[in-house]
Every structure is written in C-alpha cells, then in structure tokens.
A protein has these predicted regions:
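Glycine-biased, small-residue-rich flexible motifs in mid-sequence functional cores and linkers
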Residues: 1-4, 83-283
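Short, small/acidic-rich helices and loops at N termini and domain boundaries
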Residues: 1-87, 273
C-alpha cells in the first residue's frame, strides 16, 4: 500500500516531470518509495540529481497530502489503483518505456486478456465507418469472442466501437483523458455506466483533472500500449487516430486500416497510411 501511495504522490509532480521521467527515476532509485522517502536527499538514491530535480521534489509533502486524498477517493468509489508491480496492471503497457506510473481503473474486464485490440478513428465518422465497425465486431465476436475491445469513449468511431462491443456481449474498455470523477463527453455517460459491468474505464489522471487537449494525446499511448493491435476505421489526413497508429508502430504492435472511398475526406488518413505501408489492409 505504501508503494502505491508513494507512486500516486510522484504523479502529483506532473507536469514538471513527464511519465517517462517518472518511470526512469523509479527504475534508477529502485521504486517509488525510495524516491519519496529520500525526497530531500535524492543523491542517496539517484546518480547526480540536478538542482532542478531537487527543486521539483521539494513539493513532495504537498504531493503526499494530495495522494492520500486521491487514495481515499478511490476507496470510496471502488476504483482500483494499479502500479506496474501489480499483476492486474496491463502487462503489454508495462513493457513500454513511457508507461504510466499509476492507473485508475473501474470495471470487470481483464486488462491482460489473451487478445486485446483497439478500434480508433475520426470523431466525424460516416455511415460507411459505422457499418464497418458493426460488421467487424460481429466478425471478431464469431472468431474470438473473448477479445477485449479498447477505445477512447470519444465521439464518432470510439463510441461506435464501444456500443457495438456491448451489443455483441463483448467487453470493452474506455481509456479516458481525465479523472474518473467525470465522463466526457457527458452524453456518453449511460454507455460508460454500462461499460462498468461489461468492460471498464481506465485513466492515468486523478480526480479533478479536466479533459485538456494535451491529455488526449497522452491518452493515446495507453490505448496503443495495452493492445496487441490498432484498427484504424476512418481518419482524415491528419487525424488523431494516426497518432495512435504511429505510437503502436513505435511499440512494435500491429497496425491495420480499412480503406475507404478516394473521394471521402474521412478515409484519406487510412488510404495514405496503407499506401505508405504504415498499416496492413483490412478488407
């Protein structure tokens, strides 16, 4: 429990320290507790800590107070706090160098299911994209019914993927860009509630964290990292789904994309990615 509390405290030092920096520091020191217990004498657990780093760590007492409040909130709302040493922590994600030091999770899905795919794409999906998801998830259900479907609970492709997974009795997890004290967008609240008993909600952000734009980009690495493969359904030429595909490639994961009409802006990103051999074609 102490290492969990200390891990939460370290994340309270963001944005001064990035997730990658936090993981690197923990590896160097041994674990989160070593850093927290020696926050005012970092040279005892780290090789040549900079003055800037020492200054950041001077706020550790306040970070610990906030971490205790967060842990109380999680206990009150049945939220699991997962750190990399926990068996329930997504092991695929754990192998990524910039994995989150802490994850907050509500749900009943196994985050280490034998098969996990993410389904991603534009927020402005077309009827074509919706039909692709509908048929694709039916096919996945027939071939591998225990596959866990991951997406981001956003408008468009994301929510369509979640709802079709639920409709087919498949578990689905939404990775959020904010704390578990809210649902964004609010109109997806009922779907999110249903997912708690047939999948779950996952985030690296504590309560009171708002869905800022930068958080969505950070969220994408979790979507990519916890999955075996990324499935891009529709994307504009510079769509956010392409970011997730790029991260997946960097992690050594498979990337697939559905081709679309050459006249459709919603398929331009998919077609370009396939043409550049950045994704395997799904037909």
């Amino acid at each position: 429990m102490k290492n969990t509390l200390d891990s939460i405290a370290l994340t309270m030092l963001r944005p001064a320290l990035s997730p990658l920096q936090l993981m690197q520091l923990c590896r160097q020191a041994g674990d989160a507790t070593a850093l927290v217990d020696n926050y005012d004498r970092l040279e005892e657990v780290l090789p040549s800590p900079s003055d800037k780093l020492k200054t950041v760590f001077q706020s550790m007492p306040d970070a610990l107070d906030r971490a205790k409040m967060e842990l109380d909130f999680c206990e009150k709302h049945q939220i699991q706090v997962l750190i990399p040493t926990d068996t329930a922590y997504p092991q695929r994600l754990k192998n990524c160098e910039d994995a989150p030091l802490v994850l907050y999770y509500r749900g009943n899905a196994d985050l280490n299911s034998a098969r996990i795919i993410n389904i991603i794409g534009t927020r402005r999906c077309t009827f074509y994209g919706q039909e692709i998801i509908k048929n694709f998830i039916k096919d996945i259900k027939s071939a591998s019914p225990d596959t866990l479907i991951v997406s981001g609970l956003a408008y468009g492709i994301d929510i369509c993927a979640h709802r079709n997974a639920l409709a087919n009795g498949m578990k689905t997890v939404g990775v959020l860009a904010h704390g578990l004290d809210m649902i964004y967008p609010s109109m997806h609240r009922e779907t999110a509630k249903e997912m708690l008993s047939c999948g779950g909600l996952l985030t690296e952000y504590p309560q009171l964290t708002r869905p800022d734009k930068r958080n969505f980009v950070q969220r994408n690495r979790i979507v990519a990292g916890m999955s075996d493969a990324s499935i891009l359904v529709e994307s504009a030429s510079h769509g956010g789904g392409l970011i997730t595909c790029g991260i997946s490639t960097g992690y050594g994961r498979d990337v697939y994309a559905f081709p679309g009409p050459v006249t459709s802006p919603a398929s331009a990103g998919c077609n370009n990615l396939i043409r550049a051999k950045g994704a395997s074609l799904i037909t």
